[in-house]
């Protein structure tokens, strides 16, 4: 699991720099890159805290071993807290509604190829990690047991679909529209 964290951070560092490259045309790209850096760091911190909680509860960082040991600990508050920290951390990195506030400026002020790269890879990588943890480490039975889908993900997904679609519709800047549309698509 720790290797996943290192991979995410190395790839994130490069995207922060790429967003800042837009400063040649507009100095606001530096602020957008800084906000992206801060939000990405907060997300990474949440993710690492979740990994720490998992290690504390199970004594391993191997995904297969974690899945095996977590299956017996569905009611363990440490495991549930670890799951919450991992979801919030990856939610920030993936710009899932309502944790998406850094995304519109990062898309808008980054150079166009960078915005296209971000929309196609950087945020989707965090979604992959989140889904990998949900279905490989925690297992669907754990998700069903804690009621995450009905109580948290479904309401936010519905709000994201409508609120972000309306926000995208009201935008005049194409890249900002793409950012809001990306958040709405994550809701689907």
Describe every region a protein language model picked out:
Residues 1-2, 16-188:
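Hydrophobic transmembrane alpha-helices and their helix-loop junctions in integral membrane proteins
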Residues 13:
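Active-site-proximal acidic secondary-structure segment that organizes catalysis
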Residues 9:
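Short phosphate-coordinating micro-motif centered on Lys-Gly-acidic
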């Amino acid at each position: 699991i720790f290797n996943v964290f290192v991979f995410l951070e190395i790839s994130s560092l490069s995207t922060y720099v790429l967003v800042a490259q837009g400063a040649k045309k507009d100095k606001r790209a530096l602020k957008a890159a800084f906000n992206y850096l801060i939000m990405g760091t907060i997300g990474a911190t949440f993710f690492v805290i979740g990994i720490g909680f998992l290690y504390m509860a199970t004594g391993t960082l191997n995904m297969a071993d974690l899945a095996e040991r977590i299956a017996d600990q569905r009611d363990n508050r440490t495991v549930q807290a670890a799951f919450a920290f991992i979801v919030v951390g990856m939610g920030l990195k993936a710009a899932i509604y309502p944790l998406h506030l850094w995304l519109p400026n990062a898309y808008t002020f980054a150079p166009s190829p960078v915005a296209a790269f971000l929309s196609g890879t950087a945020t989707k990588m965090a979604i992959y990690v989140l889904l990998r943890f949900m279905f490989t480490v925690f297992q669907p039975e754990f998700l069903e047991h804690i009621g995450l889908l009905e109580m948290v993900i479904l309401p936010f997904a519905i709000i994201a679909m409508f609120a972000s679609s309306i926000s995208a519709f009201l935008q005049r800047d194409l890249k900002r529209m793409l950012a809001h549309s990306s958040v709405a698509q994550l809701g689907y």
